[in-house]
Amino acid sequence: MTDNNTALKKAGLKVTLPRLKILEVLQEPDNHHVSAEDLYKRLIDMGEEIGLATVYRVLNQFDDAGIVTRHNFEGGKSVFELTQQHHHDHLICLDCGKVIEFSDDSIELRQREIASRHGIRLTNHSLYLYGHCAEGDCRETNTPTTRWKNNSPFR
């Protein structure tokens, strides 16, 4: 927990129990691309009494401080992941909401070449590729209205 205290202070944030608990949940291995609602449910499951409004507020503070990265994937729901040192892109299933992170040097090179050809010095970018799971039919158990809920890492 000392590392989390240091990380919060380094980001210019006061160390509070809600911030520490939310950071702790975000560090769990299965909690990549988690929504505020799913994070809140996980805290409740852990017996923590942190309100949903506090979860939203802390996630916004973490986003502003660079601790988390906010993604707005198809479906309109913001999801958060701890900010990583290495750049990666995302594949997203439109049916079940599964998110796959990947890196491809040839794609990165091509994007820089295109930007340069148009006189742009690339400083950052996001690449989201949307499709449907190729193996099996994830739609049998996931309807479009529940795809994000069913993709929760807290199932």
Curated annotation (Swiss-Prot):
It is found in: Cytoplasm. Zn(2+) binds at residues 33, 81, 90, 93, 96, 101. One of its GO terms (cellular component) is cytosol. Keywords: Cytoplasm, DNA-binding, Iron, Metal-binding, Repressor, Transcription, Transcription regulation, Zinc. Fe cation binds at residues 87, 89, 108, 125. Residues 1-84 are annotated as: DNA-binding. One of its GO terms (molecular function) is zinc ion binding. InterPro entries: FUR, Fur_C, WH-like_DNA-bd_sf, WH_DNA-bd_sf. Homodimer. Acts as a global negative controlling element, employing Fe(2+) as a cofactor to bind the operator of the repressed genes. Regulates the expression of several outer-membrane proteins including the iron transport operon. Belongs to the Fur family. This is Ferric uptake regulation protein. It comes from Klebsiella pneumoniae.
